[in-house]
A protein has these predicted regions:
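Long, charged/polar, low-complexity intrinsically disordered N-terminal extensions
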Residues: 1-122
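Acidic, contiguous N-terminal accessory segments
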Residues: 7-10, 113-203, 209-212
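Structural motif
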Residues: 203-207, 457-461, 486-489, 508-510, ...
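Long, hydrophobic alpha/beta structural blocks
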Residues: 209, 226-244, 248, 268, ...
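Long, continuous compositionally biased terminal/linker segments
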Residues: 233-281
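A domain-level signal for caspase-like cysteine endopeptidase catalytic cores
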Residues: 318-504
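Catalytic cores of nucleophile-dependent amide-cleaving enzymes
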Residues: 503-588
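Caspase-like cysteine protease fold
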Residues: 522-524, 583-711
Length: 711
């Protein structure tokens, strides 16, 4: 069992140990108790462990919100100071180190102090306590031979992390992190990784090009993956073909099933008004579908032609290209955990200089130059005529060039918002994902909200304008930033800066084939033996990819780098945009996506490492981008795109704080409101600082408040 519950040895209460999260906490009772095993079905929500004790009260050593439901699951109230009369209750306490639920029949009262939360019954009674691991880290590591047929057994266990097989697993909190996979001589499965019998089978030929594209399906469907041909998904009495166009049909099955689960789950624990449920043109019996076993439900989902469903589906968030090679097997659990659409490209298209792909003229020796303004310069050190000053004009023509052995690849376009690449080569317009960065995500855990450290390094006087980004970090309520701005660092000072425990490094300066330019000499991270404490970074300098990749290999989670020379003015603009987005809680990949909408030069940048890295949590949880436009006299159109972010993954519910819409939406759906009064829009814009596109240009919500005042 992943959770142990034991009596406290020196006090009245229980100690709870979560072996998945490696956490332990205590809760206290008004008398010594002996926990007795209880059925997990005694609770309204799924739990990993359940015990019954006799007590007159429960206390936890933290301030929490207590949610009370009736015996049938109807939500009655939530808060930290209330009382309810005699009745049968299901009570949830949040936050807690695990999900914590109580079931009992008694009048009770909730109270809090500045350090504790208490639930007191009128008289001692049996209380059944349920615990569910937050499961943000894997339950263990599966060892397996890496040939495709052997690997199928490991992929079949990815769904063991699911907390339920009901449609509620479309909530990210009910999808645990899949177990890790690593090469081994034979299959070894940790005791805590227990298979889930969903009744779903995925049949594919034993080849990487067929196995990799179904890993997200295997996880979300808790499916057994078996060798066979033709490719298909099947359950008792039904079969869904995955050919022709195998990868496309696999992606469609994931999107369709997930969408239907989000609609069907309104029949369960959370009967909310869901916009997508209210507007669907599909005449399905969602209540009946909700009650079906997973395999039967999935069969009925997939019996609906995709062409009928497609117009209602939101744009999916992420596609990951995973080269069909054995060395990439260890990244599969991370890709599946993000519910990414997966492709397995067997061939790679090399990116050539001069193509319309972001490399332009900047690859290799500078024989030609992109046009620059008379007072413009690039962020690499290169020869230049006096009329166009450059940084480090003493350099040879090779300076600023990416190493000759660097292979740039041009992945096929995607229909999703974001794109990641796993395998050899430097992808254009995609996140270069790496295994070490994903492992650091697990080590980092949840983003801490106490203090966020940002280091801005500006190593060139001509770039001081971007150094002012320091003023953009810390523009947040409830989150405290420690911001350090440093100029003109020496090589040794730069080494010390990179080794410091910093949440985000914003580097402004020169990078070339010799490394990062310092005041005395260069620091080449690819050759240096140095410790890196920086968690995330933006290296806003010419062709900084290799230095950024070295940062990730040496300790960082991820960062934004350039593939080409970058002109100073647009680089400054992009740096300021990224600063504000990271400050607002966006992750690296989504921040760069938004920046690319504003600046065409954004395509000269990519993310290396873990694109899901954030430095602080968005106040809204999810990352939100708005679009506004004039609708009619005195009113506005408002569109909101919500992106998954950290623990607020795909399937998260969100709701706009406007009276024009009472409906809930799920990530990654878009909310579109046609006629919002100026006063209402003004109130919404004032809630928090958000990126807003108005007349196809990026603004910030606080900057647009005067617009609504003019109406």
């Amino acid at each position: 069992m992943s959770i142990d519950i034991d009596p406290l040895p020196d006090a009245a209460g229980l100690t709870v140990t979560d072996h998945i999260e490696n956490t332990q906490f205590e809760l206290y009772t008004d008398r010594p108790v002996e926990p007795a095993a209880a059925p997990e079905t005694a609770h309204y929500f799924p739990v990993d462990a359940s015990v019954t004790v006799e007590t007159g009260g429960i206390e936890i050593p933290r301030v929490a919100v207590v949610e009370a439901r009736s015996g049938d699951g109807t939500l009655l109230t939530r808060g930290d100071d209330y009382a309810l009369p005699a009745g049968e209750y299901h009570v949830g306490i949040d936050p807690a180190p695990t999900k914590l639920y109580l079931s009992f029949s008694s009048p009770f009262a909730v109270s809090t102090t500045d350090r504790t939360t208490r639930i007191d019954l009128d008289a001692p009674a049996e209380v059944t306590l349920g615990f569910r691991s937050l499961h943000q880290v894997p339950a263990g590591t599966i060892e397996t031979p890496t040939d495709p047929e052997s690997l199928m057994d490991a992929v079949s266990l990815l769904g063991s992390a699911l907390q339920t097989t009901s449609p509620e697993r479309s909530f990210p909190t009910l999808r645990g992190h899949p177990p890790l996979i690593e090469p081994g001589e034979r299959l070894r499965v940790p005791d805590r990784v227990e298979p889930t019998d969903s009744g779903v089978r995925i049949v594919v030929p034993p080849e990487y090009r067929y196995l990799y594209p179904v890993v997200s399906l295997a996880y979300y469907f808790a499916a057994e993956v078996v060798p066979g041909d033709p490719p298909r998904i099947e359950g008792d009495g039904w079969t869904h073909a995955l050919e022709p166009d195998f990868e496309r049909r696999a992606a469609e099955a994931l999107r369709q099933a997930f969408h239907f689960d989000c609609l069907a789950r309104t029949e369960g624990f959370y009967p909310v008004d869901l916009h997508e449920r209210e507007t669907t043109a599909l005449d399905l019996d969602w209540g009946r579908l909700y009650d079906l076993p997973l395999a039967t439900r999935l069969g009925e989902y997939l019996a609906v032609p995709f062409e009928r469903v497609e117009p209602e589906l939101p744009q999916w968030t992420l596609t990951t290209d995973v080269r069909p090679e054995p060395e990439n097997v260890e990244l599969l659990p991370f890709v599946a955990g993000e519910l990414s659409i997966v492709r397995a490209p067997e061939t790679v298209t090399p990116a050539t200089a001069g193509a319309d792909n972001g490399l332009g003229f900047f690859r290799g020796p500078r024989t030609e130059a992109a046009p620059l303004g008379p007072n413009e310069f690039v962020r690499g050190a290169t020869e230049a005529p006096p009329a166009a000053p450059t940084r480090g004009a003493d350099a040879s023509g090779e300076r600023g060039a990416v190493a000759a052995d660097t292979e740039f690849v041009q992945p096929e376009p995607v229909d999703t918002v974001e794109h990641a690449w796993v395998g050899a080569g430097v992808p254009l317009d995609a996140n270069k994902a790496t295994l070490d960065a994903y492992h650091r995500r697990l080590e980092a855990g949840a983003v801490e909200q106490s203090r966020i450290s940002v280091l801005v390094v500006c190593n060139d006087e001509q770039m001081r304008a971007e150094g002012e980004v320091a003023d953009l970090y810390g523009l947040r309520d409830m989150v405290q930033f420690d911001i350090d701005v440093r100029h003109d660092l020496t090589r040794e000072e730069m080494r010390e800066a990179l080794a410091s425990d910093v949440d985000f490094l914003h580097y402004i300066g020169h990078v070339d084939d010799r490394g990062m330019q310092c005041t005395d000499e260069y620091l080449d991270l690819t050759n240096e033996d140095l410790a890196v404490g920086v968690s995330a970074f933006l290296l806003n300098a010419c062709q900084s990819y290799q230095q950024g990749e070295a940062l990730v290999h040496r300790g960082s989670r991820g960062g934004i780098v350039t593939l080409t020379d970058v002109a100073n003015s647009p680089a400054t603009q992009l740096g300021r945009i990224i600063a504000r987005l990271m400050n607002s809680g966006f992750n690296l990949r989504t921040a760069l996506h938004v920046a690319k909408r504003e600046l065409i030069t954004g395509h000269q940048y990519i993310v290396v490492g873990d694109g899901g890295t954030t430095i602080c949590q968005s106040r809204s949880g999810v990352a939100v981008v708005g679009n506004i436009g004039e609708s009619s006299s005195g009113s506005w159109s408002l569109g909101v795109q919500a992106y998954p972010n950290g623990p607020y993954g795909v399937g998260t519910l969100y709701k706009l704080a406007t009276s024009s819409s009472d409906a809930n939406y799920f990530v990654p759906s878009t909310c579109e409101l046609k006629s919002v009064p100026s006063t209402e829009l003004s109130d919404w814009l004032g809630l928090e600082t958000l990126p807003i596109f108005y007349r196809d240009e990026l603004h910030w919500s606080d900057e647009l408040l005067p617009l609504t005042d003019q109406e």
